[in-house]
Amino acid sequence: MRVAATTRPASSSAAAPLPLFLLLAVAAAAAALFLVGSASLAMAGHVLGGAHDAPSAANSVETDALARFAVDEHNKRENALLEFVRVVEAKEQVVAGTLHHLTLEALEAGRKKVYEAKVWVKPWLDFKELQEFRNTGDATTFTNADLGAKKGGHEPGWRDVPVHDPVVKDAADHAVKSIQQRSNSLFPYELLEIVRAKAEVVEDFAKFDILMKLKRGNKEEKFKAEVHKNLEGAFVLNQMQQEHDESSSQ
């Protein structure tokens, strides 16, 4: 009887490490799941933040190649005959790879139009796919060649032009640079949106009246600018003023 009583504690102590091991395993698994979940949330937050500007990529060989790929893929899918001209704007969004948001010019039956395309790239898989391709309107081509012809072709006065037009974007970029040069702020101005744009051809230059939404630090502001473009293609900021409304004063 005494011998049997002395053997029971031994068997109990031998089984004790098993629950401890299980607890450690469960704790490790929970920690791993937490880390994975945190990483997923971080990635989701980055994606939800939207695409960010990639100004240096707008004129790069790689971006041109992506834009040509987008045009070629669209032509194949729609049996179209678009001809790539140039990249106007390039943005990037981090997903499982990179989603390139491209604004580009292409010719359709000799007429220049503006398109927005999204190209998904996974470099490690040599994967590239056109996600979206859509027309945003005709390009307003105030070029050296046709500026003179348009002087007599348009009725006098301002007329609305597409905010995505490449020349309007160039005029807005010039205005932002000029505003930045005149500012003593430590924070640079960033163009968020062209809200409205008008154009008028007068004598030997084109005038652009542009309402822009800019960001400086954490503050958003609206500016109205008049930019002139001469026959040589040079932009000059003629005048600008800050617009005050409820959204910009907050």
From Swiss-Prot:
GO molecular function annotation: cysteine-type endopeptidase inhibitor activity
Biological process, per Gene Ontology: defense response
Highest rank taxon of the organism: Eukaryota
CDD domains on file: CY (cd00042)
GO cellular component, one term: extracellular region
Pfam families hit by this protein: SQAPI (PF16845)
Keyword line: Plant defense, Protease inhibitor, Repeat, Secreted, Signal, Thiol protease inhibitor
Domain spans labelled Cystatin: 49-137, 156-202
InterPro entries, sorted: Cystatin, Cystatin_dom, Cystatin_sf, Prot_inh_cystat_CS
Keyword Flavoprotein: no
Described purpose of this protein according to its UniProt entry: Specific inhibitor of cysteine proteinases. Probably involved in the regulation of endogenous processes and in defense against pests and pathogens.
Family in the record: Belongs to the cystatin family. Phytocystatin subfamily.
Name by which UniProt lists this protein: Cysteine proteinase inhibitor 12
Protein's organism: Oryza sativa subsp. japonica
Taxonomic placement: Eukaryota, Viridiplantae, Streptophyta, Embryophyta, Tracheophyta
